[in-house]
Amino acid sequence: MADLIGLAIVFLIFALVAYVLGARGVAGLSMTIAKWLVIIFIVLAIITILL
């Protein structure tokens, strides 16, 4: 699961850099991907804790 949170952080950083450089479409897409990866990570972490 560490890889999943790592990917989310990478996409978050990519989105912030793209936003600063003015590529708003790329930034929005990267933020969406990062958001879903964080949600998946949290769900999997909760399932792991419960099992």
UniProtKB/Swiss-Prot annotation:
Q: Where in the cell is it found?
A: Cell membrane
Q: Which NCBIfam families match?
A: PRK13682.1-4 (NF010229)
Which membrane topology term applies here?
Multi-pass membrane protein
Q: Which Pfam families does this UniProt record tie to the protein? A: DUF1328
- Tell me its family: Belongs to the UPF0391 family.
Q: What is this protein called in UniProt?
A: UPF0391 membrane protein Mbur_2216
Q: What is its main location?
A: membrane
Q: Where does the source fall among the domains of life?
A: Archaea
Lineage runs: Archaea, Methanobacteriati, Methanobacteriota, Stenosarchaea group, Methanomicrobia
Instruction: Name the UniProt key words of this record, in alphabetical order.
Output: Cell membrane, Membrane, Transmembrane, Transmembrane helix
